Regions:
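Short, surface-exposed binding/anchoring microloops in extracellular/periplasmic proteins
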Residues: 38-68
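Bacterial Sec-dependent N-terminal signal peptides
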Residues: 1-24
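Solvent-exposed, conformationally flexible loop/turn segments
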Residues: 39-41, 90-95
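Solvent-exposed serine/threonine-rich low-complexity stretches and specific carbohydrate-binding patches
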Residues: 33-35, 82-90
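Noncatalytic modules at the cell exterior or secretory-pathway interfaces
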Residues: 53-59, 102-118
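Exposed aromatic-hydrophobic patches
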Residues: 44-49, 94-102
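Transition segment at domain starts
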Residues: 20-47
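Short, surface-exposed beta-strand/strand-loop-strand elements in extracellular ectodomains
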Residues: 63-85, 121-131
């Protein structure tokens, strides 16, 4: 009987902790780089340094709202991937997770075309995160 109580307690604690730890924590994501959007319509290039390869990326907009018109990811092998985001991001919003075709890919650069929303709120920061 004592072993059954101990076993049930262990199962209960394990179940409790499994709900407390998110499966997609920031620990799984690596910071790739960021850009500060100028006022109005702006095109920026984020050059990616290092030898890391990623399966997925996502972006997070902070400091001010931003309308992302277009985003292109250029890989080391010369291929290009157009990412259709066309979205208004509020301060603190994240994009969906963007999967790369073919698994692990080395990123050479990411080009953004965006427009600042609400100039009085300041310049938006666009941060790119990658997952292996």
């Amino acid at each position: 009987m004592r072993y059954i109580k101990s076993f049930l307690l262990l199962i209960g604690i394990t179940t409790l902790f499994s709900f407390m730890v998110p499966s997609n924590t920031l620990q799984d994501w690596r910071f790739i780089g960021d850009k500060i959007a100028a006022y109005g319509v702006d095109r920026d290039v984020l050059w990616v340094n290092g030898n890391d390869a990623f399966r997925q990326i996502k972006i997070r907009v902070t400091s001010a709202p931003l309308h992302i018109i277009d985003m292109d990811v250029y890989f080391e092998n010369g291929e290009k991937m157009n990412v259709a985001l066309k979205n208004n991001f509020r301060q603190g919003d994240e994009s969906r997770v963007i999967d790369f075709p073919g698994g692990l890919r080395k990123i050479k650069k990411i080009e953004f075309l965006y427009e600042t929303i609400g100039v009085r709120k300041g310049k938006a920061r666009v941060a790119v995160w990658g997952k292996r």
